[in-house]
Amino acid sequence: MKLRRERFERRNGSGKNSQSSSSWMVTFTDLITLILVFFILLFSMSQIDLQKFKAAVDSIQKEGNGLQPDQTSIEKKNTSPSDTKKQEDQQDQLLKKVNTYIKDNHLKAQMTAKRDERGVVLVLQEAVLFDTGEAKVLKNAETLLHQIAVLLQTIPNDIQVEGHTDSRNISTYRYPSNWELSAARASGVIQYFTSKEKLPSKRFIAVGYADTKPVKDNKTNEHMKENRRVEIVIKKSKTTSS
């Protein structure tokens, strides 16, 4: 009778082996549950940190303008009324000097001078310096550029040379657009000053504006002619020569 009972228990999975198997399954299930809870907690914590990080970034972005004022604002704050008046007087004297030089050297037909927020500006029309659609300085223009170089040698300020075009599109192998043409013209003028006249290259910067800064609308040939120009900007400086 006892033997039959043992056989029955073995067939039906009862006994110690069955109990051990069930206990193992319970332990494994508990372990999986704990791991799942652990990762849920980690995910929740990471979400909280991410929200805090986003909030901090938003706060910095809102205050960004106050943390990084532009250079112009700094200069304005650091410039006293007396310094501003002095700089204005220096610019007036420089413009007067330039106009006197232009008159004495009979250059009025080839260039003009003006003053704006950049400094004192020498304006040269395209026909004086280049062939249409080209950036190589004309041989005939070298006399004019030499006279300008003589003037610049007496002025310690930095110089910005700007190329400008009219609104007509250009598309050549050398100059795919007005941007390349205007920049090449500015660079060509600087190349003459630094290579032929031996002016320090560190004083110069070349800028090409294409047709983005016209002085007239481009509705007539005469207006387009005025827009095709090179501007030599004698930049403002505390050491402006009188």
From Swiss-Prot:
Keyword entries, A-Z:
Cell membrane, Membrane, Transmembrane, Transmembrane helix, Transport
The portions of this protein that span the membrane are: 24-44
- Which GO annotations describe the biological process of this protein? bacterial-type flagellum-dependent cell motility
**SUPFAM superfamilies given in the database record:** OmpA-like
**Where does this protein reside within or beyond the cell?**
Cell membrane
GO CC, any one term: bacterial-type flagellum stator complex
**InterPro entries given in the database record:** Bact_OuterMem_StrucFunc, MotB-like_N_dom, OmpA-like, OmpA-like_sf
Protein topology in the membrane: Single-pass type II membrane protein
Known function: May be involved in some transport function.
The name under which this protein is listed is Uncharacterized protein YtxE
| Annotated source species | Bacillus subtilis (strain 168)
High-level lineage: Bacteria, Bacillati, Bacillota, Bacilli, Bacillales
